[in-house]
Amino acid sequence: MKVAISKLPDSGWWSKGMPKYNDNPAMIESAIPNLKLLNEERTKLKNVILQNGHDVIEFDFPDELDRKEPKHDFIFIRDSFISDQNGTAVILSARQPTRRIENTIVKKYLRSLNMDIIQMPNSPDLKADGGEFYLCKKDNILFSGLKRNSLQGAQFVAEQLKVKSMVLVEGEGFHLDTYFTPALNKRGRIAALIVCLKI
């Protein structure tokens, strides 16, 4: 498996303070992340991926997102798309308007890997963030949250990925990946679900 991650912005991740999104209780306006810790954790993440026999693809952080008004959320690269894990990516349409530029940029990066691209249509009814999905390929099940995904957006993704089942998960987190994750066994099948019941 190939795992795509973003390099950090040259200016340092939110080195002048992060923004606050109304639907994200974890963000503290103007907070500055601990960049030393961030770099250590990022190195550990890469090592774990490599030690488990997977490849790491590092995309350069886009210059156009590291300017006077930085858009550093791009490091959450999975928010912009979802892959069928077989060479096709669905480019999503972020609910947060300021993040939609990320969808456009990641499409260029994925094309450079010769991936087939499916573009979610630009429609007010179709909204989806990658952090709201888990695709369990071996079981052919798509889990979807509905905080930043619209129901129609989730259905569009399920249709494009040709999944057997889609499970809608309601929770308090702003993204499904903040309170829920499937645990897979060595064969890649769902063995357990890890759920945070209270945030």
Protein language model annotation of sequence segments:
Residues 1-199:
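The feature marks the mature, well-folded catalytic cores of soluble enzymes
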